[in-house]
Amino acid sequence: MDDAVSRATNGHDAVEDMGSTTSLINRDLIRYARHIVLPGFGQEAQRRLRDSRVLVVGAGGLGSPVLLYLSAAGVGYLTILDDDVVDESNLQRQVIHRQADVGRPKALSAKDAVQRLNPHLVAEAVVARLGTDNALDLVKDHDLILDCTDNFTTRYLASDAAEITGTPLVWGTILQYQGQLSVFWPDRGPMLRDLFPEVPAADSVPSAVVGGTFGPVVGQVGSMMATEAVKVLTGIGTPAVGKLVVVDALGVGARTLSFAADPD
């Protein structure tokens, strides 16, 4: 047992009760030792991850790193929502899927991947699109939403459902070499409609098919979204509420812009 594991377990076995909100089992103390020894993290933050229910809308480019990192981090329950199937052209950036998954529903492929990575979590695949008929029912049972979609109709719907239910939402988007992300937390900061009051003109934003997508920037932004999710779920750090983080893969680093709720 290395030093980090020894410090995490503190030399004692934990109560073996996954349903308990007061203890981690010894297996978890070992698996998540590098989290637990972090300053400001500890067993309490890890327990919060274990007890969290997270809805990930979209199991494509952004959904791939989001799902992999949240499952590895120890989120206890993941709902994966996507109505699309894996296409070979997806594999350049949608790293949760394999060649053998081509033609399979993305939600099912992603569920298999996260359970291979962490067999101790519960993963639910929902092969459907977020719509007016299911949005509130899906969102209300979760502690956090991650919007990994690629169209404004679904983005507005996810944000509106988050606002109605009071559920925080981590949002991200990719355009060629660039990405953006933010956290929309009802009653704590502005929402998506404050940032984008109107849908951008259809011809102003090229699709991935037409304009292309730089694979590594998808991983960058998706990993940052997973970081924001962990901050929201555990209470560590400062989530990007009221902040728009802009990543330019051809430059160096990222820049952060502030925005506020529309007074109207």
Question: What is the role of each PLM region?
Answer:
Residues M1-D264:
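Adenine nucleotide-associated cytosolic modules
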